[in-house]
């Protein structure tokens, strides 16, 4: 304490007396310190519990994710020839594959130039337009085609690169093409020629016959003479490598692919070709991976139980309970987890509804035991149903209906699906027959396209086109527009049986539409007739479990307030009427993950309990401050009292000494 004194006049040990008195007075402070230590210990215990719950939640990630069950294991007998990956739509199977050709990209080269940094042409702003398509017919000699035709691939966007005085060197052209990242790679190769050694080499970024190049330069004449390349006409570049498709057989069936990543040959699998040769390919369920995940789940659960036992248990030997013994939060969490594991799930209609059906059982001590043989059998015979036992999953009886998602409100169960209208795409169909003659597009022709909600003004390359060529040009040009691409807006262009131009949005639903507006150059009336506004698409409509559902594009979602609330289904076409059932399961890993995420969140039960303790600690701190202030005053009072006592005793001692002296003097005078 702050006040110090000793019994000078009384010879009393004042400090010792006050210390002993204050020890008695401070007993409430000692009690508060013990209570504070208890609260701090609980905070530490809650931190340990939260960490254990978080570790348990981490063990659920692979089981909670449906893709862990859907992606098959692909094994190639010769990985130097091919390898494969799978998606959720793949099925187990075995395949013999013979690769006879690898896909390759077309490569063309310019005439040699004396230097790489010397300006080419006048520097007038020019545009390099690159189409991608197929070269057919004719013959190829010394890198030049004769009598060939070029058919544009409408699915590949037109590439346009601007060249002006800032980049009209060989290096500048190379860098501009590469920076555009529009499907062509440029490089400069020197052949050692003493006069003109440097060649601009252009390679299609995609392999296959449909990605050959057709290059047209508008603007500077020198650039035109260097780069114009039409396999069906003028060719100022020579072909070094011909675009080629991959060729292979899968179980004896001939397959061609524009890419060495072959899709579609085996449903749900992508085959990556590396060299010519043969290999067996096996697709199988990832049973070993899932079994390892289940074992990891069981171990993590048992680790959590051991932590809970340590935190909430009672030691009969010491007759002491753990820090969280009887704690409502800890016991409540433990009971809720056990409740989830002891409750059957509906599953996906395959008969697996409890953990015990796949060999997992709760023991008397609360731990989870795994029957490896029973688990292995379940994974081998009912793999997809095991997925429904753990993950959030949906399985439709109709192959054209896919489970798309759910919400926390979606109830487990089987729901009937009835479709009253299939979703459609927005489209614009002209009323002018464009097949009877050529379509001539003037220079500086621009059209404003509105695709869905995206709007952009698009320049159409000048030229004379057949109806199919023009449709391909429009599709590639629109889909190559940066503004529309950024918005995810795409179209498909075609010519109807009546010869009309048809533009169809890539999306479905009421927001899907296409409209056109003249800006400059050739009028829309030259190829679309009088039609400039398309017909919007429509949303899917129908019911889930007999109750009206909400349609958005091809997605049908269960309405609020129903058992199917939030259940989303992708309706990939098909007929109207009853479409079978969708089985929805919220598996154990899914339920536990949702529960644990809430439990350890900032608004969960552990955080609430910790907040309450922290509030108690704040209250304790205030009590300590008040008590310390009172003790300070008590000690000061004791010291004041002892000081006064000391003075009195000192005065009495002085009086006693005086009287003693006087009596002694009196006695001496009487002698």
Question: Where does each model-flagged region fall?
Answer:
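Short, charged, intrinsically disordered terminal tails
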Residues: 660-671
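C-terminal or internal capping secondary-structure element at the end of a domain, subdomain, or sheet
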Residues: 649-652, 656
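Mature extracytoplasmic/periplasmic domains
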Residues: 316-329
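Contiguous, amphipathic alpha-helical segments that mediate oligomerization or scaffolding
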Residues: 33-67, 304-318, 624, 630, ...
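Bacterial flagellar/type III secretion structural subunits and associated motility module proteins
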Residues: 1-34, 50, 58-199, 203-307, ...
């Amino acid at each position: 304490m702050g006040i110090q004194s000793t019994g000078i006049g009384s010879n009393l040990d004042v400090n010792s007396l006050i210390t002993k008195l204050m020890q008695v007075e401070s007993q409430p402070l000692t009690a508060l310190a013990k209570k504070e230590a208890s609260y701090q210990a609980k905070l530490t215990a809650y931190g340990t519990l939260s960490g254990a719950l978080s570790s348990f939640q981490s063990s659920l990630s692979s089981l909670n994710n449906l893709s862990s069950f859907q992606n098959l294991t692909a094994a190639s007998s010769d990985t130097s020839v091919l390898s494969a990956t799978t998606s959720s739509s793949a099925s187990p199977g075995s395949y013999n594959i013979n690769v006879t050709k690898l896909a390759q990209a077309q490569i063309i080269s310019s005439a040699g130039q004396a230097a790489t940094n010397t300006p080419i042409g006048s520097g007038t702003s020019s545009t390099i337009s690159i189409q991608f398509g197929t070269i057919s017919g004719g013959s190829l000699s010394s890198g030049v085609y004769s009598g060939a035709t070029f058919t544009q691939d409408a699915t590949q966007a037109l590439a346009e690169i601007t060249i002006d005085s800032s980049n009209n060197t060989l290096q500048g052209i190379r860098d501009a093409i590469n920076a555009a990242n529009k499907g062509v790679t440029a490089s400069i190769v020197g052949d050692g020629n003493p006069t003109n050694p440097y060649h601009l080499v252009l390679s299609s970024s995609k392999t296959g016959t449909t990605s050959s190049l057709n290059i047209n330069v508008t603007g500077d004449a020198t650039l035109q003479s260097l780069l114009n390349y039409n396999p069906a006409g003028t060719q100022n570049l020579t072909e070094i490598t011909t675009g080629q498709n991959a060729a292979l057989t899968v179980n004896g069936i001939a397959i061609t692919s524009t890419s060495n990543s072959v899709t579609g040959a085996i449903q749900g699998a992508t085959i990556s070709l590396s060299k010519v040769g043969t290999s067996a390919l096996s697709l199988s369920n990832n049973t070993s991976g899932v079994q390892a995940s289940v074992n990891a789940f069981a171990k993590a659960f048992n680790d959590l139980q051991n932590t809970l036992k340590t935190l909430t248990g009672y030691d009969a030997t010491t007759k002491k309970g753990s820090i969280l013994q009887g704690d409502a939060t800890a016991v409540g969490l433990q009971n809720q987890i056990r409740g989830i594991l002891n409750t059957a799930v509906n599953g996906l209609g395959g008969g697996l509804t409890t953990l015990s059906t796949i060999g997992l059982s709760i023991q008397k001590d609360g731990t989870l035991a795994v029957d490896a043989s029973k688990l292995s059998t379940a994974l081998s015979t009912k793999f997809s149903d095991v997925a429904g036992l753990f993950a959030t999953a949906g399985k439709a009886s109709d192959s054209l209906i896919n489970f798309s998602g759910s919400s926390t409100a979606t109830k487990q169960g089987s729901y009937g699906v009835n479709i009253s209208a299939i979703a459609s795409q927005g489209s614009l169909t002209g009323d002018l027959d464009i097949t009877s003659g050529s379509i001539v597009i003037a220079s500086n022709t621009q059209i404003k396209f509105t695709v869905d909600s995206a709007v952009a003004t698009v320049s159409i390359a000048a030229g004379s086109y057949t109806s199919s060529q023009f449709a391909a040009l429009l599709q590639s040009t629109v889909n190559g527009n940066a503004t529309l691409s950024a918005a995810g807006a795409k179209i498909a262009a075609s010519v109807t049986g009546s010869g009309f131009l048809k533009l169809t949005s890539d999306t479905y639903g009421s927001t899907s539409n296409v409209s056109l507006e003249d800006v400059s150059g050739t009028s829309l009336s030259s190829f679309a007739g009088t039609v400039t506004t398309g017909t919007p698409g429509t949303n899917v409509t129908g019911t889930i479990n007999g109750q009206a559902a909400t349609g958005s594009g091809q997605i049908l979602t269960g309405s609020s307030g129903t058992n199917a609330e939030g259940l989303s289904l992708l309706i990939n076409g098909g007929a109207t009427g009853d479409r079978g059932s969708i089985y929805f399961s919220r598996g154990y890993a899914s339920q536990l993950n949702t529960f644990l995420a809430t439990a350890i969140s900032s608004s969960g039960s552990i955080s609430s309990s910790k907040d309450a303790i922290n509030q108690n600690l704040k209250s304790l701190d205030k009590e300590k401050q008040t008590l310390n202030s009172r003790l300070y005053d008590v000690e000061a009072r004791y010291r004041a009292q002892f000081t006064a006592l000391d003075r009195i005793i000192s005065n009495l001692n002085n009086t006693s000494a005086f009287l003693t002296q006087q009596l002694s003097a009196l006695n001496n005078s009487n002698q």
